[in-house]
């Protein structure tokens, strides 16, 4: 997605989202079964100017009222991130405003407290794309990693499972959608390293088990739904159990 938002900091330190505009690229990438970096970057270039202007319009603020500009600096696809960074820096320079490069994962870690007060420290399960982590968020810029994946990221496992079951792109939402039509207890799937101490995760074995079962389906639609539901249910059980091992 290409996105822009205007955030207001209130006197008490809380925040208010004045506008949040998102342009999705899902239809563009759906035909390829995943994100094509070059196409994504081109779409960002085509959409970002309009998105920023609309965010300002919805917020009812002119650029002169904005105190600072922030843009995601990583982690992520640099060919895409560069688009936002360049335009963010350009706007900041033109408007004589400070520019802040934001860590993508730190944004996820702190966003739960954007409009609702959450007191530090708190335990965070961060599962975003190629990242699967349990973090102890002690304060802004103070994070302790309690566990991470030792092989595949959960996002990859969802995408690969959706592909194995021919459920289409994007994998996560489609698995969630079709899981509602299946029996989550139909397949007994492995929960890798679930009894190992600590909060580390592993999804390679689960992904292999799904591949093995998917080859036995032979086009049976209900079995595909059952396997999707069983996969999602197994993931939920793994995450809940590991949460208690911190």
Regions inferred by a protein language model and the residue ranges of each:
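Short Gly/Thr/Asp-enriched flexible loops that form oxyanion-binding sites at enzyme active sites
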Residues: 71-95
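Conserved phosphate-binding catalytic cores of ATP/NTP-utilizing and phosphoryl-transfer enzymes
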Residues: 101-123
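Glycine-rich phosphate-binding loop plus the immediately following alpha-helix
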Residues: 128, 139-183, 207-208, 212-217
């Amino acid at each position: 997605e290409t996105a822009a938002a205007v955030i207001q900091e209130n006197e008490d330190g809380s925040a208010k989202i004045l506008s949040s505009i998102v342009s999705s690229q899902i239809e563009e990438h759906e035909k390829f079964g995943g994100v094509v970096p070059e196409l994504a970057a081109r779409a960002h270039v085509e959409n970002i100017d309009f998105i920023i202007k609309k965010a300002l319009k919805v917020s009812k603020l002119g650029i002169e009222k904005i105190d600072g500009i922030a843009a995601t600096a990583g982690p992520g696809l640099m060919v895409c991130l560069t688009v936002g960074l360049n335009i963010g820096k350009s706007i900041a320079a033109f408007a004589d405003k400070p520019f802040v490069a934001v860590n993508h994962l730190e944004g996820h870690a702190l966003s739960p407290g954007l409009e609702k007060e959450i007191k530090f420290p708190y335990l965070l399960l961060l599962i975003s794309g190629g990242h699967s982590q349990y973090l102890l968020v002690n304060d802004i810029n103070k994070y302790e990693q309690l566990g991470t994946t030792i092989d595949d990221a959960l996002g990859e496992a969802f995408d690969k499972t959706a592909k194995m079951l021919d459920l289409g792109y994007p994998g996560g939402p489609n698995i969630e959608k079709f899981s509602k039509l299946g029996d989550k207890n139909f397949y007994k799937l492995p929960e890798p390293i679930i009894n190992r101490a600590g909060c580390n995760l592993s999804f390679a074995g689960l992904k292999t088990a799904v591949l093995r079962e998917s080859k036995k389906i032979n086009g049976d639609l209900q079995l595909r739904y059952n396997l999707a539901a069983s996969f999602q249910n197994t993931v939920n059980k793994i995450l809940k159990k590991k949460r208690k091992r911190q």
